Design a protein with these regions (language model features):
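Short beta-strand and adjacent tight-turn residues that come in two discontinuous sequence segments
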Residues: 94
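Short acidic/polar active-site loop segments enriched in Thr and Asp
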Residues: 90
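Conserved N-terminal beta1-alpha1 strand-loop-helix module at the mouth
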Residues: 1-79
Length: 95
């Protein structure tokens, strides 16, 4: 059976400090509960490193909000799946 996931898409919300506080609050709550689902947090790109650092120490994963259909090239502002993988991102919202 496939693992069920709860995925939080933050859209374009939170400052860096607010993102840090929220991720820490979520990590604390996840330690209190024995969930039978995986949890993935998808903050804005600027906060992915913060999310991956906290995810490594806690019971959730970090995910991206989008990725490019291209592997590389002159696509300003795009981020490839390979780039995301290099920083430890295993999940991405597509669509």
């Amino acid at each position: 059976m496939k693992e069920k996931l709860v995925i939080g898409n933050w859209k374009m919300n939170k400052s860096f400090g607010e993102a840090d506080d929220l991720l820490n609050d979520i990590a604390d709550k996840l330690q209190e509960y024995q969930l039978r689902t995986g949890v993935v947090m998808c903050p804005p790109y600027l906060y992915l490193e913060l999310a991956t650092d906290l995810a490594d120490e806690n019971d959730f994963s970090a995910g991206a909000q989008n990725c490019s259909e291209f592997d590389n090239g002159a696509y300003t502002g795009e981020i490839s799946a390979e780039m995301l993988s290099e920083i430890g991102i295993e999940f991405c919202i597509v669509g």
